[in-house]
Amino acid sequence: VYFFFIKKHKWYSIKVPVIALGGLLLMTLLKQLFNRPRPLIPLLEPVKGLSFPSGHAMMSVTFYGLLILLVWEYITNRFWKWLLTSLLVILILLIGFSRIYLRLHYFSDVMAGFAAGIIWLSLCVWIIGRMERFSKKEIDPAMAKDTDVV
């Protein structure tokens, strides 16, 4: 809503929900596909659901990774750009490794969640970026390079 109404960025108003909802769907499909049970003895309380890949790890990479991309696109101050990126990467790692510490996931679950999140985010950004360049080229050919779209 912010990107569509306030910033007038149609493509970011599409990117955020597509990446988030698609990530949730992909995570659910992967969990059903692998059907791996959680560790037997959690540190606190037992949690229902499947273990592989870690949904928290995958969605933290997806969401905070998208924020990192926004930071690099919109923040010009080099100090703030690196500080925010570093803090978001640390947050992603803490979320992932907290799942192992709490014995809710195995190490491989978290690593697979990180990998799935990186792959999903990269794929979405690439596809939506190509769609954005293609739509700009159709509206105003001067806005997009001929080499941007195959």
How would you label these PLM feature ranges?
Residues 40-150:
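Membrane-embedded catalytic cores of phosphoryl/pyrophosphoryl-handling enzymes
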Residues 1-50, 66-73, 82-84:
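Hydrophobic alpha-helical bundle signature of multipass membrane enzymes
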